[in-house]
UniProtKB/Swiss-Prot annotation:
Pathway: Amino-acid biosynthesis; L-histidine biosynthesis; L-histidine from 5-phospho-alpha-D-ribose 1-diphosphate: step 7/9. Belongs to the class-II pyridoxal-phosphate-dependent aminotransferase family. Histidinol-phosphate aminotransferase subfamily. Keywords: Amino-acid biosynthesis, Aminotransferase, Histidine biosynthesis, Pyridoxal phosphate, Transferase. This is Histidinol-phosphate aminotransferase. It catalyses: L-histidinol phosphate + 2-oxoglutarate = 3-(imidazol-4-yl)-2-oxopropyl phosphate + L-glutamate. It is an enzyme of class 2 (transferase). One of its GO terms (biological process) is L-histidine biosynthetic process. The keyword Transferase applies. Its EC number is 2.6.1.9. The keyword Amino-acid biosynthesis applies. The modification N6-(pyridoxal phosphate)lysine is found at residue 222. Gene3D superfamilies: Aspartate Aminotransferase, domain 1, Type I PLP-dependent aspartate aminotransferase-like (Major domain). The lineage of its organism: Archaea, Methanobacteriati, Methanobacteriota, Methanomada group, Methanobacteria. It comes from Methanosphaera stadtmanae (strain ATCC 43021 / DSM 3091 / JCM 11832 / MCB-3).
């Protein structure tokens, strides 16, 4: 038998949202009729300019992609209001950059602080580097970070602190004054995950001008509509970006991905419309679910919302199964540490599909 790392004996596989194909096969529903509310995607699709850029790039895919990404960095810097030497680009959405971060800053025995619940990939990635997770608290009832639970856990071993704003899966924001309290309390790297910032219409880029211990991470998978191309970017001080770049995979961002990103960033109207439509549908979902007895839904500043379904008489797994049997994919949040077995996350779809989801949800929980 091949010998593997001891850590893998207790390591759990990351659980992503489920695909239409999976649900169609498992529940016997037509794939084309499925309503997908489980993965926080852009349901309106990518920019037409991005589609054309991908088509135009086909004749280049026999060549290795550009590795230094200078032109893309210029475009991202313009969009993010930073300089290009503050930008790093990664494949696999933002997830590759989490792995590069761990390789850049973590030595065995170091600690990282992560609030719960939040995006589980932080812990999944950093534990691979033999770092120890230390848990802070996200107050579910108030949908906000317990800042003191972060501050009280900072020690000499703390290397990284993760802050997700808007928080996934709750949709709550972390006020900038709370972020500053944490930054000023430590010399550890404070990672601010802004994957969904466009939907909140606020960000923390201005802090880069004052503080060097910040890394802001973003993705093109959400409002930009490029989830299938897997590309993200990070923002920090130039020295830290240069050190990360030394160990980042060289050719992880494909030619079609690079062309699509440039085209999308140059389509300001698409970004604006995608953001506005998602916010409109988010508020529609909130008001509609909020009118259903026995479901508590949390206000959100992202393109998803968290529901507490305990009063329906169903667990999240049970209600998720019933919805999937009707062709609706939602995210059972039982796997999120910090949540119990009664939470479901839903993300926005087109308006007709959101209406159909509400109709099906009411039929299930009100009968």
């Amino acid at each position: 038998m091949v010998k593997t790392r001891a850590i893998l004996e207790e390591y759990k596989t990351y659980v992503p949202g489920r695909s239409k194909k999976e649900i169609a096969e498992e529940y016997g529903v037509a794939e084309e009729s499925i309503i997908k509310l489980g993965s926080n995607e852009n349901p309106w699709g990518p920019s037409p300019k991005a589609k054309q850029a991908i088509i135009d790039s086909i004749d280049e895919i026999n060549r290795y992609p550009e590795s230094n990404h200078e032109y893309i960095k210029e475009q991202i810097a313009k969009y993010a209001n930073v300089t290009k030497d503050q930008v790093i680009i990664g494949g696999d959405g933002a997830d590759e950059l989490f792995e590069v971060l761990a390789k850049t800053v973590i030595d065995e025995g170091d600690e990282f602080i992560v609030h719960q619940p939040t995006y589980t990939y932080y812990e999944y990635t950093f534990k691979q580097s033999n770092a120890k997770a230390v848990y802070a608290t996200w107050n579910i009832e108030e949908n906000k970070l317990d800042v003191d639970s972060v501050l009280n856990n900072i020690t000499d071993k703390t290397k990284v602190i993760f802050l997700c704003t808007p928080n996934n899966p709750t949709g709550g924001l972390i006020p900038q004054e709370d972020i500053v309290r944490i930054i000023e309390a430590t010399d550890a790297l404070v990672v601010i995950d802004e994957a969904y910032w466009e939907f909140s219409e606020v960000n923390n880029v201005n802090l880069l001008k004052k503080y060097n211990n910040i890394f802001i991470i973003r993705t093109f998978s959400k409002v930009m509509g490029l989830a299938g191309l897997r590309i993200g970017y990070g923002l920090s001080n130039p020295d830290f970006i240069e050190k990360m770049s030394r160990i980042k995979p060289v050719f992880s961002v494909t030619v079609p991905s690079q062309k699509a990103v440039i085209a999308t960033l140059n389509d300001e109207e698409f970004i604006k419309e995608s953001t506005e439509k998602a916010i409109t549908e988010r508020e529609y979902l909130y008001e509609s679910v909020n009118s259903i007895d026995n479901i508590h839904i949390y206000k959100s500043k992202s393109n998803y919302l968290l529901m507490d379904v305990r009063k329906t008489g169903y667990t999240a797994a049970e209600l998720t199964s019933k919805l999937m049997s009707r062709g609706v994919i939602v995210r059972d949040c039982t796997s999120f540490v910090g949540l119990d077995e009664y939470y479901i996350r839903i993300s926005v779809e087109t308006h007709p599909k959101n209406e159909k989801f509400i109709e099906i949800l009411k039929e299930i929980v009100e009968n």
